[in-house]
C-alpha cells in the first residue's frame, strides 16, 4: 500500500511540475524572458575572422563582454579584433588557432587561461563546407570537415568545461545547422558533422543536468542557409517558408537565445514544424514534402566562399 501511495505521490509531483513548465513556456511566448547581463563575461568565439563569428563578436563587444577571438586566418581575425575595439569592446584578445588540431587547441587554450582567464561563454562556431556529392568528395576534405565541424567541439569542451564546472558558471553554445536536423543532397559530410555536433552538445547538456551542474547552460543553434558566402550558390524554392537568412537577423536571434538561456534555436521557425513532421509522417509523405520544398536541388548551384585576392 505504501509503495502505491509513493507511486501516486511521484506521479502527482511529476504532473504538477510538468504543468508549471508548460505554463512558464506559454508565459514567455507572451512576454519576453529576462535577459542575462554578459558585461565582463569572457566570451570565446571560434571562426571569428569572418561571417557569423565576426558579427557575433561585434554584438558581444557592444554588450561589454571580454572577447577571445579564434580563427585559423590571422589577418581576418586581426580585422575582427580591430572592428570589435571600434564597436566598444574594452578587452579583445585574438589568437590564431586551427581548431581541427587537438594539440593546437590545448596549447592556445592554456595561453588564453594564463593571459585572459576562465572562459565563461564558449561559442563553437568555426565550420567548413565542401559542397560535393559523397563519391566526388576526397577523403581528406571529408576528414577536415569532421575535424572542424565536430571534433573541434570535443577539444574545446575538454579545454574549457573544467573551469566552468569548478565555478558552477558557464554557457556552451553549439552552432550546428538545419543540416544537423535533416539530411540534404550534396552535403552528406557536412550533415554528418553537424548531426554529430548537435548530438554531442545535447548529450553534454544532459550530462551537466545529471551531475546537477545547474550553473552551466547550453544553447544549440540550427539555422538554414545564411548569406555569409559560405553557401554561395545554394537556393531555396520556397523563400516564404525557408528563406535564406540575413546575417544580421540571424545574429540577433542567436544573441537573444544566449541571453535568454534558450536550449534550442531553429531558424526560420518553420524548421520546428519540419522536424515535428519528420517524426510522425510516413516516409513517402516526407519525401513529397522535401520535393515540394526543393530540398533535393537546393545545393546544385553551390560555389561556396570566394577567397579574397
Curated annotation (Swiss-Prot):
Q: What CDD domains does this protein's entry cite?
A: 17beta-HSDXI-like_SDR_c
- Active site, renumbered: 190 (proton acceptor)
Keywords annotated in UniProt: Endoplasmic reticulum, Membrane, NAD, NADP, Oxidoreductase, Transmembrane, Transmembrane helix
EC number(s) given by UniProt:
1.1.1.105
User: How does the UniProt record describe the way this protein sits in the membrane?
Assistant: Multi-pass membrane protein
Q: Where does NADP(+) bind?
A: 44-68
The terms describing its cellular component in GO are: chromatin; endoplasmic reticulum membrane; nucleus; plasma membrane; transcription repressor complex
Binding of substrate, residues:
177
Q: Has keyword Mitochondrion?
A: no
Q: Where's it found, cell-wise?
A: Endoplasmic reticulum membrane
Gene3D superfamilies in alphabetical order: NAD(P)-binding Rossmann-like Domain
Describe which pathway this protein belongs to, using the record's wording: Cofactor metabolism; retinol metabolism
- Enumerate the SUPFAM superfamilies for this protein: NAD(P)-binding Rossmann-fold domains
Q: Which reaction does it catalyse?
A: all-trans-retinol--[retinol-binding protein] + NAD(+) = all-trans-retinal--[retinol-binding protein] + NADH + H(+)
Residues making up the signal peptide according to the UniProt record: none
- A GO term for molecular function: transcription corepressor activity
Residues crossing the lipid bilayer are 11-31, 270-290
Which parts form a coiled-coil structure per UniProt? none
A GO BP entry is: retinol metabolic process
> In the UniProt record, does the keyword Lipid metabolism occur?
no
The source's superkingdom equals Eukaryota
Which family does this protein fall into?
A: Belongs to the short-chain dehydrogenases/reductases (SDR) family.
Its annotated function is as follows: Oxidoreductase with strong preference for NAD. Active in both the oxidative and reductive directions. Oxidizes all-trans-retinol in all-trans-retinaldehyde. No activity was detected with 11-cis-retinol or 11-cis-retinaldehyde as substrates with either NAD(+)/NADH or NADP(+)/NADPH.
This protein is called what? Epidermal retinol dehydrogenase 2
Write down the species. Mus musculus (Mouse)
User: What's the gene?
Assistant: Sdr16c5
